[in-house]
């Protein structure tokens, strides 16, 4: 996939902007609070229907305006598409090639974006739910079926928990079947994804720094290295049976993929406890790169890689190594307060000042 143009109307500090992007590296630089990150946010909103900066999209409406409008023209497999979103106080309207999209599950995967930002530190330092969310979002971008599976799993989980609180054993048993069916599939897909990500991750990391890194999916449902879906389902059935009394005492379901963990280690030690800030940000950047490679290799999906405020997250040596890796990832958009070296592999350099974007190099696209 390649974004050809991005149009913003009354979005954040942009009144009216049309930006043409280059096919490879696009470096956007300028002072703080000029509108650099807003451009990445716009791409992210088009991808997922939500922002990485605020829980309310209406916060992104320019002061004094009634709504914002974002539109991207992009090509996928040599076919041109248009995706737009308009947000006002009443809600949002999303159009793909002129046809309305009414559910976010229909949007995810149409316009895949992988974002690296300083907020990614939550993947390492946050709760296990942050790491589960990381895997779920990656799998959702690969397949809309996964979005359906995870949604049905949480529906079954909510219903089973309600039955537990009501002490209704008959209803608990009835909800065990869908819980096992969807939960086993979620755990299986997460585990397979993690194994493939780990292989890619280690290859990319070996190309940059010399520490030994590892990703591992930890689940009580997975007791062997390469379990089948039936193996996981059998384990889930047995664990629910054993935990039934304890579930009734506690008032909720103790076992399942909603309790699983993605473990990140460096030199066999937990990254969260035994890594420097520089190592953590480097790891996260390579993890985002691994996502891109995973989508390309497994699903022939070529997402846009967006990297926000790269000089704030990474030292120059690590940054140079990572940017060298990015050459093979397709279209990349970065932001920084520092103007990149014009002699580097950067294909397009843009300067942003007070929501005005100018092309610095090359002179024309």
Swiss-Prot record:
Task performed by this protein: The RecF protein is involved in DNA metabolism; it is required for DNA replication and normal SOS inducibility. RecF binds preferentially to single-stranded, linear DNA. It also seems to bind ATP.
Biological process (GO), any one: double-strand break repair
Alphabetically ordered keywords of this record: ATP-binding, Cytoplasm, DNA damage, DNA repair, DNA replication, DNA-binding, Nucleotide-binding, SOS response
GO cellular component: cytoplasm
Compartments it resides in: Cytoplasm
Protein name per UniProt: DNA replication and repair protein RecF
Family: Belongs to the RecF family.
Matches recorded under PANTHER family: DNA REPLICATION AND REPAIR PROTEIN RECF
Keyword DNA repair: yes
Pfam families referenced in this protein's UniProt entry, alphabetically: SMC_N
Keyword Cytoplasm (UniProt): yes
Top-level division of the source organism's lineage: Bacteria
Coiled-coil residue spans: none
Lineage summary: Bacteria, Pseudomonadati, Chlamydiota, Chlamydiia, Chlamydiales
Binding site for ATP: 30-37
A molecular-function term among this protein's GO annotations: single-stranded DNA binding
């Amino acid at each position: 996939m390649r974004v050809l143009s991005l149009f913003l109307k009354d979005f954040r500090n942009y009144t009216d902007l049309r930006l043409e992007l280059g096919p490879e590296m696009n470096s956007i630089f300028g002072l703080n609070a000029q509108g650099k990150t807003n451009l990445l946010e716009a791409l992210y909103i088009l991808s997922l229907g939500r922002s990485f900066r605020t829980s309310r999209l209406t916060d992104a409406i320019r002061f004094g305006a009634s709504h914002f409008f974002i539109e991207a023209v992009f090509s996928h497999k040599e076919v041109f598409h248009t995706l737009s979103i308009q947000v006002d106080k009443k809600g949002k309207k999303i159009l793909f090639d002129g046809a309305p999209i009414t559910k976010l599950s229909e949007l995810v995967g149409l316009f895949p974006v992988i974002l690296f930002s300083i907020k990614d530190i939550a993947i390492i330092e946050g709760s296990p739910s942050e790491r589960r969310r990381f895997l779920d979002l990656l799998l959702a971008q690969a397949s809309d079926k996964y979005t359906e599976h995870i949604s049905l799993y949480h529906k079954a989980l909510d219903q089973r928990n309600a039955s537990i609180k009501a002490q209704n054993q008959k209803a608990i048993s009835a909800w065990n079947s869908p819980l096992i069916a969807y939960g086993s599939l979620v755990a299986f897909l997460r585990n397979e994804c993690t194994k493939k990500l780990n292989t890619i991750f280690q290859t990319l990391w070996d190309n940059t720094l010399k520490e030994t890194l590892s990703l591992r999916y930890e689940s009580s449902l997975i007791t062997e290295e390469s379990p089948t879906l039936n193996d996981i389902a059998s384990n889930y059935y047995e664990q629910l049976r054993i935990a039934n009394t304890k579930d009734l005492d506690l008032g909720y379901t103790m076992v399942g993929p909603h309790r699983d963990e993605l473990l990140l280690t460096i030199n066999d030690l937990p990254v969260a406890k035994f890594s420097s800030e520089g190592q953590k940000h480097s790891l996260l950047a390579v993890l985002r790169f691994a996502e891109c490679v995973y989508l390309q290799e497994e699903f022939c999906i070529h997402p846009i890689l967006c990297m926000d405020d790269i000089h704030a997250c990474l030292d120059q040596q690590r940054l140079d190594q990572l940017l060298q890796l990015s050459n093979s990832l397709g279209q990349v958009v970065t932001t920084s307060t520092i103007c990149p070296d014009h002699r580097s592999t950067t294909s397009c350099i843009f300067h942003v000042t007070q929501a005005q974007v100018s092309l610095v190099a090359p002179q024309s696209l």
